[in-house]
Amino acid sequence: MFKSTAYILNPLFLLLAWCIFFYTQKGLLVWVILSLLSIILTAILTSGYNFWRHKLQWFNFLVIYLGQFTFLLMLKNSTARYLSAIIICFLWAFVWWMLKAYFKNYLTPSQVEYLAFKKYWYVLNLWFFVSSCYSLIIFLSLDFYYLVLLVVLVVFSMAKDLFGTGKNLGWLFWTLSVFFFAQVFAVVYFLPVSFYVAGTLLVLWFYYFITLSLDEKKKVKGPIFIILIATIFLLISSLYIIL
């Protein structure tokens, strides 16, 4: 009974924990630890004996939760915060539901539905995470270089999980990729834009990087053109607002 409803109970618990903390402003560490344990327990119940095969995915899920929580904390409007929390929990329920179907038919040769969705799940939550990191640098004066390292590690972890074992990518590819995203994070940080825009710019290039690598360099011109236009538009609009 509990196993079959775990994908519903976990999002409800996350939402309850967020609402209680936002209302009382107490017990931050306790609620974070309980929520992380809830995610791990749900992952175990959902994946069964395949839990350790997907340990990198579960690590990314924990990072995703921390990024979401930090993002919600930096929202000043209470209505936006609670509404965002509800939407995020609906997404968690959908992810667990898809994972339940994925592991139920684990030996099926093709499980493209969840694997395709996971890319967008990671992209969205990377935006939460990166935007939160930029805000922490600005408002809490956290060390820039440590956060660069943290973002690069998260990008590497998500990309590694998305590529899986099907693509044999050498150390040179990963070294150049890590160096590229470290540069992008640093360059975007020094632009006169909000942390929302900064996070969007980095995530756009992460999406292009993932799409290009997973699609075996097919149909490259379309995505790169759209991302370049979006990058230019975001920069111009942000500078216009500032000036």
Task: Please place each PLM-identified region on the residue numbering.
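Alpha-helical transmembrane segments
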Residues: 3-19, 34-39, 57-69, 122-127, ...
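Structural signature of hydrophobic alpha-helical transmembrane segments
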Residues: 22-39, 80-94, 136-151, 192-204
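Hydrophobic alpha-helical membrane segments
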Residues: 38, 61-66, 178-181, 197-212
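C-terminal ends of transmembrane helices
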Residues: 40-54, 96-111, 155-167, 208-219
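Cytoplasmic-side transmembrane-helix entry/capping segments in multi-pass membrane proteins
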Residues: 52-64, 84-87, 109-122, 168-177, ...
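Hydrophobic alpha-helical segments and helix pairs
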Residues: 64-129
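Intrinsically disordered, low-complexity segments enriched in Gly and acidic/Ser/Thr residues
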Residues: 161-204
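Final/C-terminal transmembrane alpha-helix of multipass membrane proteins
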Residues: 223-243
